[in-house]
């Protein structure tokens, strides 16, 4: 093989870009297919998860182009928000709290722009067919304008409010977050059994948050727990702190956890919050916004949460309040960005009011076609489990500003006008006075929006970037990973319902997760990260994409080297198959043959027609792995192992007889089928297919295989049972050679074939040449048997 894969990929990348192969230029008469492409963050490098899930989207984009659609496949970056801030902090060591916030924001912009350029080259190298020449970013003025405009739309619809309310906060990132950004992790901890004094007797409770004793506002037991019925309504004294709290009963208390008695603090977890709300309990906050214990924590004041936990246990033990400790592993809510256990605080925040719309969100989810369908259950479970309105304000810096000021004189909230957007109230004065008291003494909102508040608008942002929103919304397809169903899929469906009373796309295609070869999650700490560029350097982008096509939508995948090897072997096999056809052609011009006559050529066209139907049906149903599996079998077994080997013998014999009609017919048929094989592989393996397509001199060729027509199942099946029977004879000869310990390519002196003699006689010469057999004896038999003599 003399194919330089690296140079081939570079050549076609340049060719596609120079010739605007993927430019979206619709006309009123053409079919259009629109895609809501996931905008990746700019924080870090591409990884195997990217190559897996984005390849799935690209498979469909390329297929739809070949089916005659103008495909709107934009590119964008989600470059604002906490992910970018943390990336810049890590790279520079500079934090926004160091003093110069404006300098930090400029750094975020600079790093984003530099990262975007490098990342785009990586996505191109992977063979993505997006329109990279004009991409959007979520921090651009036009994106900010859309995000702020939709915020004002929420104001008009009474779907947004600012309130002093419990919110989820990450102590590490020092910002509020939403329920969307939490994940459940199983973490090790200690369950501490602590005695409370109850009017001279003892009540033992079990807690994993003893540092919150200063925030204890009640003890709870189950109403039906016979052990504790006589103490409901009495008071207990909190150890070390001395304040008294009521003992109350509620059916939600688990009688079998710990002692069946628990303390409610403000706030240890969601259960604390629920009971606090339900019974209008007092508020005692003992952790500050930075995750430090405050004055309400008494002797723990100034300590971190973990240090406070250790110290309170020591103090409780020294005073004899600890009954016992147990090592446990339990589910803890953590921030998905940094893994820190979250806390619940009372803060003034902006919220999108949507808990009353859960049924509407379920209905919207059901109006979308899910690929695979069972992923919709995850979405519905998430919606049904929502307990909080969406907190969209963040105490950070590099994000979309709220278009809001507050009147210092009357406290009124002043919203910017649509005509003034985009606006940054932190830097720009308002264009109007307070619409309640007329004061000009207005102060800006300094919080920024949650990045998902903007990312949830990507269909609007991407289409509006090209002036196409009114024409093509809702879009046809969104592709994404199942790990962000609760993030991106849900928020986009929710915003689409609230703003437009519709769904954002017709189909939602979900990809699985990527694991190492042993099924373990990849991480730096485990040392099992696979470098995507090392894979493409060694095997090529087509092999990487081949790997990505090995599992069905929604299924997880492992990174196994044999899949990349198979992908590269397929690249080489295609290249060599096409070279063989060129060798057989021997420089003769390719002549169009409308109706082949040779039975072997009719047979391969029949087999091709079958696989075209199977592959097309599979691709129409987003079953790319099924399509590729069927194509692999046809290409490797039917086309290469049987047909190409047969026509070597057929062309050789025809040349000896000067039967140029058979030669021309066979070479044309082989070239046509090779071209169609290339077309069917093209969505998955774009580079090698372009290389081969450009080398096939056949009528009707387009500028690129990726904008040519998809093969059609365009002929009636011919009777091909005779040649199928011959392929069975070939298989038996190969097996007989193997049993005789002779390689397939090694000549043998003689073969005895017991079979349908009338068929075998027609193909005696072909079988002899193809299988390298000196002489063939044929015996008529109902049973097919073959033996060889080396």
Swiss-Prot record:
Record note on domains: ValRS has two distinct active sites: one for aminoacylation and one for editing. The misactivated threonine is translocated from the active site to the editing site.
User: GO BP, one example?
Assistant: valyl-tRNA aminoacylation
Q: Offer a single GO CC term for the protein.
A: cytosol
Summarize the protein's role.
Answer: Catalyzes the attachment of valine to tRNA(Val). As ValRS can inadvertently accommodate and process structurally similar amino acids such as threonine, to avoid such errors, it has a 'posttransfer' editing activity that hydrolyzes mischarged Thr-tRNA(Val) in a tRNA-dependent manner.
Protein's UniProt keywords contain Nucleotide-binding: yes
Protein family membership: Belongs to the class-I aminoacyl-tRNA synthetase family. ValS type 2 subfamily.
PANTHER family registered for this protein in UniProt = VALINE--TRNA LIGASE, CHLOROPLASTIC_MITOCHONDRIAL 2, VALYL-TRNA SYNTHETASES
HAMAP family documented for this protein: Val_tRNA_synth_type2
Q: Where does this protein chiefly localize?
A: cytoplasm
Residues forming the motif 'HIGH' region are 40-50
Native organism is Thermoplasma volcanium (strain ATCC 51530 / DSM 4299 / JCM 9571 / NBRC 15438 / GSS1)
Entry protein name: Valine--tRNA ligase
Show which residues constitute the signal peptide. none
Does Membrane appear among the keywords?
A: no
Keywords noted in UniProt = Aminoacyl-tRNA synthetase, ATP-binding, Cytoplasm, Ligase, Nucleotide-binding, Protein biosynthesis
